[in-house]
A protein has these predicted regions:
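Conserved P-loop
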Residues: 1-71, 114-125, 138, 159-166, ...
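Residues at the starts of beta-strands that form the adenosine-phosphate
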Residues: 30-33, 105, 132
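Conserved P-loop NTPase "ATPase switch" module shared by AAA+ and STAND
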Residues: 74-88
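Structural recognition of the conserved hydrophobic beta-strand(s) that form the central parallel beta-sheet
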Residues: 81, 104-112
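Conserved ATPase-coupling elements of RecA-like P-loop NTPase cores
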Residues: 84-95, 113-120
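Conserved catalytic/switch belt of AAA+ P-loop NTPases
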Residues: 96-104
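Conserved AAA+ ATPase "SRH/arginine-finger" region at the nucleotide-binding site
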Residues: 132-142
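Short Cys/His-rich metal-coordination motifs, predominantly Zn2+-binding knuckles/fingers
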Residues: 143-147, 183
Length: 215
């Protein structure tokens, strides 16, 4: 039994990592139970784990996790994989049941922060419970030189949609872009990164006048 946590921004290869993990364990004869959230229908209406290159593996799509404990596929599994973990409100009790009670191996994959750099869902609550935590990075879409992207920036339209709904929206390259710290801060708060103008030098004659009046 073990718990591995894979976190990072969008376009960091998390779905590709899931596919690699699943195929590797299936090649060893393991029964693998893969879960994704039902609200993620970006690429297909079928329950699948899909990366941005459109490679797919079958999964169970659900709005919550605890009811899945009754499914025979779960009971027969040796490895449980949870994708889009940030969307599951019952993530922590489910994972504790899987690992601590049912003694299975579990891999949880999700965004650690939203487009505002706030903790996303219950993902970070799993850090103290994990055997291994891996922070993946994407490549900054602005640098163009392989600089690591730590954060996800929402486009103007997606940000407005999220604010109107009160929750982050599901989207892909049309809605979000991975950025390094510098370009994220530039896009979010350009004023903060604008150098302050040098202090205006007081003309010498003004200083002399001030000194005379002071006397």
């Amino acid at each position: 039994m073990s718990l591995e946590l894979l976190i990072g921004p969008m376009f960091a290869g998390k779905s590709s990592a899931i596919q690699s993990i699943v195929r590797r364990h299936q090649s060893l004869g393991w029964s693998v139970f893969v879960v994704t959230h039902s609200m993620d229908t970006r690429y297909t209406s079928e329950p699948m784990v899909v990366n941005h290159d459109m490679q797919m593996i079958p999964a169970v799509a659900a709005p919550s996790l605890m009811p899945l404990l009754e499914r025979p596929e779960y009971g027969a599994s040796r490895l449980v994989v949870v994708e889009e973990a940030q969307f599951f409100a019952d993530l922590v009790p489910f994972v504790m049941r899987v690992v601590d009670t049912d003694r299975k191996h579990c891999v949880v994959v999700g965004l650690d922060g939203d487009a505002e750099r706030r903790p996303f869902g219950r993902v970070l609550d799993l850090v103290p419970l994990s055997d291994k935590v891996t922070k993946l990075t994407a490549m900054c879409a602005r640098c163009g030189d392989g600089t690591a992207a730590l954060f996800t920036l929402a486009t103007a339209s997606e940000s407005a949609a999220a604010n109107g709904a009160g929750v982050p929206c599901v989207g892909g390259a049309e809605a979000y872009v991975p950025l390094c710290r510098h370009h994220y801060l530039t896009a979010r708060s350009p004023v903060l990164l604008t150098p302050s103008p040098p202090p205006t030098e007081v003309p010498r004659q003004v200083i002399d006048v001030l000194q005379i009046h002071a006397c």
